[in-house]
Swiss-Prot record:
Residues 9-20 have a biased composition (Basic and acidic residues). This is Large ribosomal subunit protein uL22. It comes from the Bacteria. One of its GO terms (cellular component) is cytosolic large ribosomal subunit. Belongs to the universal ribosomal protein uL22 family. GO terms for biological process: translation. The keyword tRNA processing does not apply.
Length: 128
């Protein structure tokens, strides 16, 4: 049997909320593999360094991740009262989202399936 009453269990679960500033983008129109190329480059870096890497990266995913970094930094400053100069990228990951299926007509009546993949990208910052 459970150790406590249902409301007490809920209270305890809600007490251990993650207070780190973060930003999440769901249904980003970029595949997980392509997003991870950029995310691997910025993981563990300071916020300024990560923004510099992302700004000069030619990949499409980097433009999305740049907005996410700026959003997470604004969340840290406004919601958590953190100093932007001390922030660094603690966690960043991309999870698989849904896939849109499209048909590409080919020769002699054939049709190839095109899969347009999506991902859910999360960036978590913290102070050093």
């Amino acid at each position: 049997m459970a150790n406590g009453h249902r409301s007490q269990i809920k209270r305890e679960r809600n007490a251990v909320k993650d207070t780190r500033p973060s930003a999440k983008l769901s249904y980003a129109r970029v595949s997980v593999q392509k997003a991870c190329f950029v995310l691997d480059a910025i993981r563990g870096k300071s916020l300024d360094e990560a923004l510099a890497i992302v700004m000069y990266n030619p990949r499409y995913a980097s433009s999305i991740i740049e907005k996410l970094l700026k959003s997470a930094a604004a969340n840290a400053e406004n919601n958590n009262g953190m100093d932007p100069s001390k922030l660094y990228v603690e966690e960043c990951y991309a999870n698989k989202g849904p896939t849109m299926k499209r048909v590409h007509p080919r020769a002699q009546g054939r049709a190839y399936r095109i899969e347009k993949r999506m991902s859910h990208i999360t960036v978590v910052l913290n102070e050093r």
